[in-house]
Amino acid sequence: MPVLPVPCRLPPDRPARPQPRAWRRWVLIALAALPLLAGAKTPPATPDPLAGTRQLVVVVPAGWDTTQARLQAWQRDAAGHWQPQGAAFDVSIGRAGSAWGLGLLPVPEHAAGPRKHEGDGRSTAGVFAIGTAFGYAARIDSAMPYKAAQEDSYCIDVPASPLYNTLVDAHVVGAEAVKGSTEPMRLDLHHDGDIRYREGFVIEQNPQAVPGHGSCIFAHLRRKPGETTAGCTAMEPENMQRLLAWLTPEAQPRFVLLPQAEYRRLHAAWRLPALQDATK
């Protein structure tokens, strides 16, 4: 019988070799992917808008038109968590409620609520630097920079003035420069012993002094519970004294005012204390 050729087979215990062309194709694909892998980066973490800040003064009214609110002070601990400082207390705000101001963070896109303008009787909502303390006494118990107000000290609330939204002394800038201002800083000397500016601090609303966007926003004293303001935040003397004694410029203190609904919406993105704690 003729001998038939035996088919070429690999031994059963040896794996089949890949075809040379297929092997080269996979190597080329892997090499082509290397630049893409090298260029891939982990998305950066969302920056903390309050980075560096270790003290917060938080004011939360119920709504935009509410004239009363609760204030809670907060200190950031070594682990980065906000811890309440003392008990929350009642404060009064603008006679017309509050409105978005010009602070350290932009007004959120599509945010509800009014915008602050001069003379609207609304306190400013947002996050603001806490500026200089001021008062009638030569000095106070506070580490904050302090301005001892004089009879001719004014905050300029005239939008057309080049000194708009600035604390000045008439004997320095001239009497004509303070003409028209309705904010003498020695209210006691101009209005029969008025105590409201006896102690307080500047809330740095509209630091670029954009004309008409609100000026001379302070935290100051109130003469009686429930007394509203022209746009400031007012409290009892003992509460103001505790705040001023606690605040330090090294902690980069910030003032936060947000109605409850906005606070709930923004507290995570802005790294604020939880609302249920902020309003106790």
Task: Cite the ranges covered by each PLM segment.
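Bacterial N-terminal signal peptides
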Residues: 27-35
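A conserved hydrophobic position in a structured secondary element of the catalytic/binding core
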Residues: 235
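Bacterial N-terminal signal peptides that target proteins for export
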Residues: 4-27
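Cell wall/extracellular polymer interaction/catalysis modules
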Residues: 41-230, 238-280
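Proline-rich low-complexity regions
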Residues: 20-22, 35, 95, 123-124
